[in-house]
């Protein structure tokens, strides 16, 4: 799948890879100055990142700073604990979109997934999908380190894709175990099988 990289110079490969990733600051003590620096860093020597990902309280500042660029503003909802309050997640999503978010990264209610409560998972993901319309993107964070079992990771990936996720992601980076090669392999297999 990544054979294209063999035909590129190092600079071309760096530019291509950079254009596919988010530059993120979800530090708990993040400041306005940190966000301005993040937005500035998103324009690098080798091009620009796809997006910056920030706390909801910084969406407006980021959107303002990146207004005349192709860089998208992503934010997180239901983050980092993956709760089950659909109404709160919908409200957070609407508020973020209203102030300029282009991408919503929602944490899947992973405790529900662990308990086998797929209906709660689907309900939340569908509710968010209903309000995140193209060209905006919906990304679903599975929190694979908490799911741990590859069968559950597979099923969570399937549910997210079926609910209309544009992207699936491994983790929040806020748990003891984040991305693992096994989880990534499982997720990639589900993506492949869904095409």
Question: What are these model-derived regions, one by one?
Answer:
Residues 1-8:
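Short, Lys/Arg-enriched N-terminal segments with co-localized hydrophobic residues
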Residues 10-47, 57-195:
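Alpha/beta enzyme core
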Residues 51-54:
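Short, hydrophobic beta-strand segments that form beta-sheet elements in well-ordered domains
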């Amino acid at each position: 799948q990544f054979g294209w990289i063999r035909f590129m110079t190092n600079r071309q490969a760096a530019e291509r890879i950079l254009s596919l990733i988010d530059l993120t600051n979800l530090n708990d003590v993040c400041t306005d100055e940190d966000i301005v620096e993040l937005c500035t860093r998103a324009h690098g020597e080798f091009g620009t990142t796809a997006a910056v990902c920030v706390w909801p309280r910084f969406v407006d500042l980021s959107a303002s700073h990146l207004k005349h660029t192709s860089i998208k503003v992503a934010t997180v909802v239901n983050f980092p604990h993956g709760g089950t309050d659909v109404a709160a997640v919908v409200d957070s999503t609407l508020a973020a979109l209203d102030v300029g978010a282009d991408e919503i990264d929602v944490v899947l209610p992973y405790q529900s997934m662990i308990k086998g409560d797929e209906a709660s998972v689907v309900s939340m993901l569908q509710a968010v999908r209903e309000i995140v319309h193209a060209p905006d993107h919906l990304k679903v964070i599975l929190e694979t380190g908490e799911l741990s079992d590859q069968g559950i990771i597979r099923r969570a990936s399937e549910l997210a894709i079926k609910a209309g996720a544009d992207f699936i992601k491994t983790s929040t980076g806020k748990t003891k175990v984040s991305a693992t090669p096994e989880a990534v392999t499982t997720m990639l297999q589900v993506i492949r099988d869904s095409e």
